[in-house]
Amino acid sequence: MRATRRQFIMAGAAAAVAVACTPTVPATGGRACPAVPGLGGPTPLPAPGSTGLVDEAWFSARADSFLEVGTASLSGGDINNVVAHLIRARRDPSFTWDPSQVSHTLVSGDPFRDTDDFELMYCQWALRLGRGVLPAETIAGIEAKIIGARYRYNDPLPAGTVDNKWFWSENHRGMFACDEYLGGLALPDATFTFTGLTGAQHAARTRQVVVDWLKERTKFGFFEWHSNTYLKYSYAPVLTLLEFAEDPEIASLAATVADTAMLDLAANTFHCVFGASHGRGYKAGKLSYSGESSFNTCKLLFDNTDRPFNNGNDIGPLYLIGQSRYRVPEAVRRIGASNDVAVVRERHGLPLDPHEPYSLQPVAPFGYDYADEKNLPFWWSTGALTAWQMVPVSLAAAKKWNLFDTELFQKFAKVKDFLDTSPGLAQVVVR
């Protein structure tokens, strides 16, 4: 039988650090070596505290140290600060705070604003943890936000309206799928604004999208190579699914992807700084550790730096702490905490050769047909918006869905004239 990807990571990583761990039954309080998991198909997640996962008392202490920062004061208009308070209250019955001070307008009302999917993900946590705790008006506003969201670029759009959201990068694809699936499950009987579908129908149509995106990560890794900005926004929706999705297949896949992301951090950090070569890196993250989006996650898990947590509302560690069913493998923690020198060999992405010989029907790798619009989100998430193989379908979709009117596509608007002449000519020019 074949091991699942998660079992492979746990077993392989455990073998790699076996020389550094104590026997399975520690003699003097040292942590036990992770047990090699069995083989087979997807299985229920091992409960927190199980052999092979981080020590539960250790993790609880790390969580407390982070939440002390995040809940030092209440910012009633900051949804992530509110979620930090909700998570701490769920973990610690002795913790007291005043939910009545939370704003009734905790979320924005603009469904066409870029990064709206981020806020919709935050809503999943605030809604589920906040029902019966937060003011009724706040909960009603969150529910209205979920119902009134436009989750897909090809969902109906009122005439004359421009939707400036970016739907297609790796993290946005995962986040929108998470938002729609969990939002639909949370409000199954509500009628959603743009589609007229019920929440249950939204969840049903999105389940396979979620599964496919997770499987892509297990097969191809992360397209945004070691991004010290965006990796967090790829694993945050995975952690959200892990906590709130009841589907066994989704839970198993999400655990695999979460382990992979945490191992990616562990193998490529130095004193909690994600210091590998980067794709999609920005100035703030290049000049200082404090600008990296995963610093606090690494500080929580690996804690091999004296630098303090610098953002108590950071969703990376917050969503790990908020897990009731998932914990990081102990072997991954040890890799991240180790100062040993090692060679890391990785492969992320898939081959797309922009210099291959021109063809009217180029053959796509792994069966992701360039000419099929259903594969457009996949290819665009690899960064292949302007690859010559994708030009015809990219131009057609952009025109069909009025994407050239959006802020992020306006710079490409001049190329739409090729649609009225020859998309094939556009391919040749681009190549």
Language model: regions and residue ranges:
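N-terminal secretory signal peptides and thylakoid transit peptides that target proteins
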Residues: M1-A15
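Ser/Thr/Asn(+Pro)-rich, low-complexity disordered segments
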Residues: G30-M175, L187-P188, L197, Q201-V210, ...
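Alpha-helical scaffold elements that line and support the substrate/ligand-binding pocket
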Residues: E180, K232-A245
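Alpha-helical scaffold segments in carbohydrate-active enzymes
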Residues: A186, V209-D212, E216, T240, ...
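Inter-helical turn/loop segments and adjacent helix faces that build the functional surface
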Residues: A190-F194, L241-L253
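Extended amphipathic alpha-helical segments with heptad-repeat/coiled-coil character used for oligomerization
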Residues: S252-L320
